[in-house]
């Protein structure tokens, strides 16, 4: 007999997470604690509950640009090796507690050099935090694998340097590269040099595209930049026509995205907050899943969106009536799309994900 699809049961399901920002997932208590240690006095609240509420309400803005504003506070308390290590360590703990068995967590080193750290020092501190967190969770019987995506900000001019950083650390926990930030006015083709460098080194990358700006951003990311995955990509729905009888017709961009099995790192709650969708029930996740796009479930920013992988899955279950088989398919989609080697992906699918879902399905 199937285990009921309640939130508490979903928390027991194994999960694979591809799109999660380190600076968007801090514990409010940690933000307050580090702010006190480093003398940062610009926080909008002085107690945990009020600060948590502020992050959530400030981020629920209806636009991507306003959604990004609260990050100034989290980034401000992530400027020392100790703070970076702590935030990374706690990230691993929090994901493992939510039954995430594999995660790729991304962050932009260029945002963490205000106090004089080098890019290498910033990245080494985060990777050490991930590794120490993995060991601690494994010792408690809660194994998780966490790898890093190094992000460049699309409005800046450091993407080639950040891509080189990703390659320097490719054997130390970094599995790929990304660009992020406001899409409007900052097309991905401005960073072709970085993407060409990654390809020339046989390395993988994802691109934030189609979150707020629409089809042109997705087209550039795929046709000119050669993205292996799309961060969000939700606006691909603009290239899909649904006829009155329920059939669909894919435009050329949607067709190649589906045909090439390019993964979509979909983040439903975040899309609601930024105004990309009006409600979870109106999110195109279900249409894309039904049309057999490579859809994956992601958190984006756990603090700002007040979410977790379990909550994202539960919201989708409530909105679209998904069953355990659907959640397993989305999880395997994510694991297939991870940037670690094929044999490692297969091992996690066959030895962890499928057996644990089998218990839940009954």
Curated annotation (Swiss-Prot):
The keyword RNA-binding does not apply. Its cofactor is Zn(2+). Transmembrane segments: none annotated. Substrate binds at residues 21, 23, 181. The record marks 232 as: Important for catalytic activity. GO terms for cellular component: cytosol. Its EC number is 3.5.4.4. GO terms for molecular function: 2'-deoxyadenosine deaminase activity; adenosine deaminase activity; zinc ion binding. Binds 1 zinc ion per subunit. The keyword DNA-binding does not apply. It catalyses: adenosine + H2O + H(+) = inosine + NH4(+); 2'-deoxyadenosine + H2O + H(+) = 2'-deoxyinosine + NH4(+). This is Adenosine deaminase. It comes from Mycobacterium leprae (strain TN).
């Amino acid at each position: 007999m199937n285990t009921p699809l309640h939130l508490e049961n979903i928390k027991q399901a194994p999960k694979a997470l591809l799109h999660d920002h380190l600076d968007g997932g801090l514990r409010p208590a940690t933000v307050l604690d580090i702010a006190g240690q480093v003398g940062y006095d610009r926080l909008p609240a002085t107690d945990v509950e009020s600060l948590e509420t502020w992050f959530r309400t400030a981020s629920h803005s209806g636009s991507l640009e306003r959604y990004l504003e609260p990050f100034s506070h989290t980034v401000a308390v992530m400027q020392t090796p100790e703070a970076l290590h702590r935030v990374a360590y706690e990230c691993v703990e929090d994901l493992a507690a939510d039954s995430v068995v594999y995660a790729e967590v991304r962050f932009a080193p260029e945002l963490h050099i205000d106090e004089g750290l080098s890019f290498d020092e910033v990245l080494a501190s985060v990777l050490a935090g991930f590794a120490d967190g993995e060991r601690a969770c494994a010792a408690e019987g809660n194994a998780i694998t966490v790898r890093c995506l190094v992000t460049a900000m699309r409005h800046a001019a450091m993407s080639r340097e950040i891509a080189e950083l990703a390659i320097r650390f490719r054997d130390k926990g970094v599995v790929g590269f990304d660009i992020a930030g406001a899409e409007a006015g900052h097309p991905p083709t401005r960073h072709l040099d970085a993407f060409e460098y990654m390809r020339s080194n046989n390395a993988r990358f994802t691109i934030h595209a189609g979150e707020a700006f629409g089809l042109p951003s997705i087209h550039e990311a795929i046709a000119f930049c050669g993205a292996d995955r799309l961060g969000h990509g939700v606006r691909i729905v603009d290239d899909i026509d649904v006829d009155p009888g329920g059939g669909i017709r894919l435009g050329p961009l949607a067709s190649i995205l589906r045909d090439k099995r390019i993964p979509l790192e979909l983040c439903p709650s975040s899309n609601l907050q930024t105004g990309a969708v009006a409600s979870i029930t109106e999110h195109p996740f279900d249409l894309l899943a039904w049309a057999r796009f490579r859809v994956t479930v992601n958190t984006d920013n756990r603090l700002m969106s007040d979410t977790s992988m379990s909550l994202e899955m539960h919201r989708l279950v409530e909105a679209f009536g998904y069953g355990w088989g659907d959640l397993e398919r989305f999880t395997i989609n994510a694991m297939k799309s991870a940037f670690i080697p094929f044999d490692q992906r297969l091992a996690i699918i066959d030895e962890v994900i499928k057996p644990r879902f089998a218990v839940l399905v009954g």
